[in-house]
Design a protein with these regions (language model features):
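Glycine-rich beta-alpha-beta "Rossmann" dinucleotide-binding loop(s) and their flanking helix/strand
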Residues: 105, 114, 118-141
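Short, hinge-like loop/turn segments at secondary-structure boundaries
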Residues: 52-57, 133, 156-157
Length: 175
């Protein structure tokens, strides 16, 4: 998609490129709707940090979050969806001629429908000493990417629910 400041118009604009946003892109584009997916980060959202997702439709044996995101992206792209990454949505307005989203560096995009699939953010521990080490030994949801670097180290997982257990199991293969 060419970067320009002139407003473009899409039938469907999806904010977020995690599993929910990618699913919306597949369905919208497969129905022939001009579809644009915008994400302030990259492809897959938090799902990319999961080594195994077992509760997603169509994958009874599970799939890695990264692979799920890549396959969904390819499927949406085949149907004609467009993608813009590293763009933050700074404004959403309803005007007399439709909905308009303003992107950080891209300008305005018009759409008949805007779907917000912004996902979630990791709950931080809130300990200043740990925050200073973020990415330098302290990771939030980084089990997949950080695991090989943990070889021979003691690893501690703080958190609950399914994703913490999956991270602990995945990290145990390396640490």
């Amino acid at each position: 998609l060419e970067m320009r400041r002139v407003p473009i118009t899409k039938r469907v604009l999806v904010v977020g490129a995690g599993p929910a946003g990618l699913s919306a892109a597949v369905y919208g584009a497969s129905e022939g709707f001009s579809t644009l997916v915008v994400d302030e980060g990259g492809l897959g959202g938090q799902a990319t940090s999961s080594s195994l997702i077992r509760n997603y439709l169509g994958f009874p044996r599970g799939i890695s979050g990264r692979r799920l995101a890549q396959q969904a992206y390819e499927q949406a792209w085949v149907f004609g969806a467009n993608f813009v990454f590293m763009q933050r949505v700074t404004d959403l307005r309803r005007e007399h001629d439709g909905l308009f989203v303003t992107l950080s560096d891209f300008g305005r995009v018009g759409a008949r429908a805007v779907l917000l699939a912004t996902g979630a953010s990791y709950r931080r521990v809130g300990v200043p000493a740990l925050e200073a080490l973020n990415g330098l030994g302290v990771f939030y949801g980084g089990a997949v990417s950080a695991a090989p670097a943990m070889a021979g180290h003691d690893v501690y997982v703080l958190g609950g629910a399914n994703s913490a257990g999956q991270s602990a199991l995945h990290l145990s293969r390396y640490a």
